[in-house]
Swiss-Prot record:
Reactions this protein catalyses: GMP + ATP = GDP + ADP
Keywords assigned: ATP-binding, Cytoplasm, Kinase, Nucleotide-binding, Transferase
Family annotation (HAMAP family): Guanylate_kinase (MF_00328)
Function summary: Essential for recycling GMP and indirectly, cGMP.
GO molecular function: ATP binding; guanylate kinase activity
One GO CC annotation: cytosol
Annotated localization: Cytoplasm
Residues the record lists as binding ATP: 22-29
Record gene name: gmk
Protein name as catalogued: Guanylate kinase
Length: 220
């Protein structure tokens, strides 16, 4: 039956927490950016970090760059949903904007490492959809880091050493995507998001919809 006003049926749902992790250079930031550009119901959870800003990064868009003292204040005040130390720098997710967005039905995207993903799953498992992105080879991973041309040789070496330990955590994620083709990897993540949005336990408005559906008596 077509609605009288020709508008689609809207069923309220709680937003989900889409966690994307990978070793540096595996493509998570590119995929996350493409997802944000295409899907307007997804917002990026902007982390705070004590890491120095790269030339290509914009304050408030990529990260909120703060001092170690301010980070410790937020952490100790329970203002962070998760936090981690990565490559000698601290990263964390502010609690308030995430909870407000999800309550309004918006999905939040988290570009974080396995430590942060683990904390989010411990605290808010029902809301989390976690995806780990793998590179096709370690040689390709190294090439991507060099092509990025944003880090020194010493930093690249550290990232490559840490990448093996990060990859060991692939089993802790709900989904695993092999990024040997960027478009195919992106389409795989799109499919995951679409499926997760229609899970029964996320659509709290479904109960009212089904009740009204059963109460409806079409005129013959």
């Amino acid at each position: 039956m077509v609605p009288v006003n020709n508008s689609p049926v809207t069923i309220a749902r709680r937003g989900l927490m889409l966690v994307i992790s990978s070793p540096s250079g595996a493509g998570k930031s590119t995929i996350a950016r493409n997802l944000l550009e295409k899907d307007k119901n997804i917002s990026l959870s902007v982390s705070v970090t004590t890491r120095p800003r790269r030339q290509s990064e914009i304050e408030g868009i990529h990260y909120h760059f703060i001092s170690k003292r301010d980070f410790e204040r937020m952490r100790d005040g329970d203002e962070l949903l998760e936090w981690a130390e990565v490559h000698g720098n601290f990263y964390g997710t502010p609690r308030e904007p995430v909870e407000a967005a999800m309550a309004a039905g918006r999905d939040m995207l988290f570009d974080i490492d396995w430590q942060g993903a683990e904390q989010l799953q411990d605290k808010m498992k029902a809301d989390v959809v976690s995806i780990f992105i793998l590179p096709p080879t370690m040689t390709e991973l190294q090439s991507r880091l060099h092509r990025r041309a944003e880090d020194s040789e010493e930093v690249i070496k550290t990232r490559l050493l840490n990448s093996r330990a990060e990859i060991e955590h692939w089993r802790d994620y709900d989904y695993v995507i092999l990024n040997d083709d960027l478009q195919a990897a992106f389409e795989g993540i799109e499919a995951i998001v679409k499926a997760e949005r229609v899970r029964r336990d996320r659509r709290h408005g479904m109960f009212d919809f089904v009740r009204s559906l059963l109460e409806e008596e079409p005129k013959l």
